[in-house]
Regions:
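N-terminal Rossmann-like dinucleotide-binding module
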Residues: 1-50
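Beta-loop-alpha module in the N-terminal Rossmann-like domain of NAD(P)-dependent dehydrogenases
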Residues: 20, 53-113
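Short, conserved SAM-binding/catalytic segment
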Residues: 45-53, 113-117
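Hydrophobic residues in well-ordered beta-strands that form the structural core
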Residues: 96, 121-123, 228, 255
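Rossmann-fold dehydrogenase core element
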Residues: 109-126, 144-149
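Predominantly a Rossmann-like dinucleotide-binding segment in NAD(P)-dependent oxidoreductases
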Residues: 127-208
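Contiguous beta-strand/loop segments that form the cofactor/metal-binding neighborhood of enzyme cores
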Residues: 183-264
């Protein structure tokens, strides 16, 4: 397969799935062999470069007919475990958006299956390869120990964005959906092991089955502490909705918002979640 294009089946063609599909289309060495989504056959909004690709509404059918080498899974979180296992059983490598599963047991089952089949498993921790976030982490690692890490991402969503969030909350809470990124970042910043985690939450609406707000605290074995907060819904405040701040004995470093030329950043703008205007650094010696 080294001299041939990797045949990719894209499962889930929403915000993330569409982004990945467009990337596969542009990157040499990949060939998209199908798009799979429950409502894909009736869609007329796909970009021109994807519009003529084979479409499937059933994962089993898509795996059998498209015969992919790899599967890109970008569906709602409560399907990740099932679809990963199906892809491995079909002899495919897997890229899956976070979180890997909705339970620890489910995540372990996917990892075990990847090892048993000898296939690659890659999880979409985009911040691990984001240039600005890599620099943010590197700067944090120069601040000494312990670190105090303060992060949040609250989203004042309404209309289509609120519908999307409510659908996500059929699977899990905001603190799990988003928190996996930032706890992973905290682990990289400290290079330490978490020893204690606790959190609280609240359900601020009767339109969801789960809490739509929560915050967690993580303690590490080097004395560092981390805080993360996430809330979704039309009731959420946009005051300090994007905090990415790390403090150590030698100073602090922060990601600052909004973007250049703006006086305000919308909290429900998905693109703003990974954009950075600048890193603000401070030395305790100044």
């Amino acid at each position: 397969m080294q001299n041939e294009a990797v045949r990719v089946l894209v499962v889930g063609v929403g915000n993330m799935g569409l982004s990945h599909a467009l990337a596969y289309d542009k990157i040499e060495g990949f060939e998209i062999v199908g798009l799979c989504s429950r409502s894909i056959r009736g869609r007329n909004d796909l970009p021109a470069e994807l519009a003529s690709l084979p479409r499937y509404e059933n994962v089993d059918e898509a795996l059998a007919e498209s015969r992919p080498d790899a599967v890109s899974i970008n569906t709602y979180p409560n399907t990740h475990e099932e679809f990963c296992l199906k892809a491995f059983d079909a002899g495919c490598h897997v890229f899956v958006e976070k979180p890997l599963a909705t339970t620890v047991e489910g995540a372990q089952a996917v990892v075990d299956k990847a090892r048993a089949t000898g296939k690659k498993l890659v999880i979409g921790y985009i911040l691990r390869v984001h240039p600005a976030w890599k620099e943010f982490i590197a700067r944090a690692q120069t601040l000494g120990k312990p670190l105090v890490m303060r992060m949040n991402l609250n989203q004042q969503s309404r209309g289509p964005a609120w519908n999307w969030h409510r659908n996500l909350m059929e699977s899990l809470t905001p603190i799990v959906d988003c928190g996996v990124h930032y706890v992973d970042v905290m682990c990289q910043m400290t290079g330490a092991q978490p020893v204690r985690v606790h959190g609280v939450g609240a359900q601020l609406t009767d339109q969801t089955k789960v809490q739509n707000y929560g915050h967690l605290h993580v303690e590490f074995d080097d004395g560092s502490v981390g805080w993360y907060e996430a809330g979704w819904g039309p009731m959420m405040s946009e005051v300090a909705f994007f905090v990415k701040d790390v403090v150590g004995p030698k100073g602090c470093v922060s990601i600052v918002m909004p973007q250049e030329g703006q006086d305000h950043a919308a909290s429900d703008d998905i693109d703003s979640h990974t954009k950075t205007n600048a890193l603000l650094c401070h030395s305790s010696e100044i």
